[in-house]
């Protein structure tokens, strides 16, 4: 995924000094995806979830906004919450203006790798350079 992020014009960085609890972030203005090396466990599954989540924000940038309409997002979040409510508890920590993009990212982080890559290529195809 990091290679695709770079091809889309986004820098992928690993920080050794993130605030406690922060696993990753995407800074739209700097077009940088940050992975927090000091907080991520040595577990490829966890690293993948964080990378998929932050790559969802890259997809939103490529798409020029939300990836799905609000009604569809509501239905998908409700279905996902029935399977695992945990990823959605943190939404209340965000300003309400961020709920849609963060909910989309949480849905994407739960998808299999192949689907995440396919979505990335779909939404960022115009930005991907050979």
Predicted regions and their residues:
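Catalytic Zn2+-binding segment of zinc metalloproteases
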Residues: 55-72
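Non-transmembrane alpha-helical segments in soluble domains
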Residues: 48, 52, 56, 106-110
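Soluble non-cytosolic domains of exported or imported proteins
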Residues: 41-50, 95-103
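Metalloprotease/metallohydrolase-associated module, dominated by Zn2+-dependent proteases
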Residues: 7-20, 69-130
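Conserved small/polar residues in nucleotide/adenosyl-binding loops
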Residues: 1-5
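Active-site scaffold of zinc-dependent metalloenzymes
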Residues: 11-48, 61-62
């Amino acid at each position: 995924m990091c290679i695709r992020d770079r091809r889309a014009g986004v820098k992928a960085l690993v920080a050794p000094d993130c605030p406690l609890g922060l696993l990753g972030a995407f800074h739209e203005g700097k077009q940088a995806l940050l992975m927090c090396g000091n907080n991520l466990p040595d577990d490829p599954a966890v690293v993948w979830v964080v990378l998929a989540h932050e790559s969802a924000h890259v997809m939103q940038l490529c798409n020029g906004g939300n990836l799905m309409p609000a009604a569809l997002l509501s239905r998908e979040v409700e279905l996902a919450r029935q399977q695992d409510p945990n990823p959605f508890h943190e939404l209340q920590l965000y300003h309400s203006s961020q709920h849609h993009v963060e909910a989309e990212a949480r849905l994407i982080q739960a998808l299999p790798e192949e689907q995440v890559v396919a979505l990335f290529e779909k939404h960022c195809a115009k930005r991907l350079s050979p």
